Amino acid sequence: MLRIIFFTLFCLVLNAKEISPEFSLKTSGAVTDFIVENNILYIGTTASSIDIFSLEKKERINSITIPKIKDFLGDIIDAKIFSVDKINNKILILSQGENGGRNIFIYEDNKLQNIINAKDRLFIAQAKFLDDNHILYALLSNQIFIYDIKNSKIINEIQVSQSSFSHFVLSDDKKTILVTDESGVINQYDTKDLKKLNTFKGQNVDRVFQIDIKKDTILASGQDRRAAIYFTNGKVPFYKSFDFLVYAGALSPSSNLACVSSDENNNALVFDINKNEDKYLLTQNKAILTKILFLDEKNIAISSDDENINFYNLKIKE
């Protein structure tokens, strides 16, 4: 029976059109996170740097360097960037600190300000801007905090659950946050008061690695080898099964398409959510995928656990 299931999945993927990268960008270290704003790419790396690329020129135009750190043996090493974000002229950087702690920096006007220090021993897993004066960050212990930058204080916090934290995502308007963890459950909160609004569960039965939300559609990429789709408008949820862990995933701006890591060869599958139809197989990624991002409906950027970001144009196979 198991062989039949795997054969069926293999045949479905064969129906997807293979697409190789249109171009690639090489960074200063392994890519951990990236964002795009106004055709400018901001890339967090393992090499104590944020690399800044122009997508139009396809070249690096700047970089931000953060201080190196001492490891447990006293050796000087690069600080790994865990997450990066941007609002107006401010860039938010969450990075590895000494003794297992985390640093949060804000880069503005060519100056680097350390707003949360590794000495506080906070094991922060992810941080994003809520607005110009507030950030939202999550601890590995699955606590969510809203932090006032100007007054240097926490103004609200919640304990999501006793499960270890995996990932959070803000809605495009930043009015809600979705949080997921090792339980496979997704909780949605209002970012004004961190009041719980909804819970989505049942489609994943193990840790969810990443989540995304666009319009009324939620994508969950799971350790259970499932890509789960939930809807905030009451539509029936479903999941797609794969023969490998689904490490990363993203939704297109329209929420019509999803792209997820799909196999042990580091390929990514694009499928139509409304038709549950496999469309494209994005190939030539050389390591486990770390992030997928739709630049628009037809262009996708994919990073893996190496120094390259691949860019795919879906129009090529239309």
Residue ranges and their predicted role:
Residues 55-58, 107-111, 148-152, 190-194, ...:
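Short loop/turn segments that connect beta-strands within beta-propeller blades
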Residues 34, 82-84, 127, 168, ...:
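Hydrophobic core register within WD40 beta-propeller blades
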Residues 23-50:
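Beta-strand-rich domains and repeat architectures in extracellular enzymes and scaffolds
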Residues 36-38, 86-88, 130-132, 172-173, ...:
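Residue-level detector of Asp-centered blade-edge/turn motifs that repeat once per structural unit
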Residues 288-318:
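Blade-level signature of beta-propeller repeat domains, shared across WD40, Kelch, NHL, RCC1
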Residues 49-53, 99-105, 143-146, 185-188, ...:
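Structural motif
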Residues 41, 91-92, 135-136, 177, ...:
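Hydrophobic beta-strand positions that form the internal "hydrophobic ladder"
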Residues 20-26, 59-74, 111-118, 153-159, ...:
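A short beta-strand motif characteristic of beta-propeller blades
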